[in-house]
Amino acid sequence: MALALSFSQEEGDGLFLCNWAKYLKLDEELEKIEARSDLDDLSDLRNLIQREPDFLDARVSLGMHCYRNDDFGNAKAVAETGLAVANELIPARFKGTIAWLRVENRAFLRLLSLAALSNARLGRHGEALAHIMRSMKYNPDDELGLRGVLGSELLRTGEDATAKRC
């Protein structure tokens, strides 16, 4: 049984959909992996991603592990690879929101945040700003708090006038 990640639009809002029964089984497996004290051995997490590439939550877990260990290059790579999976599902013409209130959207929004923060730590401020702006467009309520780094990234990219309005 595959996870079968897809994207749906309802009244202008976007929603990632999947086989919920499969998701719950994968989430349980992910929780067991994350609970282990030997998480420095990431092979089980990498194997889960390889086996279920649409399971974005596993990518968030791996990326956050890299980020917490100051491995910003790998955190960025993991986030952007996960975003590539999700982006293939979002229609180019989609202009709506992807709300945090929908649990199904949270992994995608976390990947956007991780990509923004990793790029910022790597000094790739233009890329960081692009991810922040995209996240704010999709999720204007900004539950992940990227608005807090928006001004700094605007200044770092030379957009002083815009930064002053933030």
Identify the function of each model-found stretch.
Residues 129-164:
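Hydrophobic, aromatic-enriched interface-forming segments
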Residues 1-98, 115, 119-141:
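N-terminal alpha-helical interaction modules that lie
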Residues 24-31, 61, 110, 114, ...:
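"A position-specific structural signal for the A-helix of alpha-solenoid helical repeats
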Residues 92-113, 144-157:
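TPR/TPR-like alpha-solenoid helical repeat scaffolds
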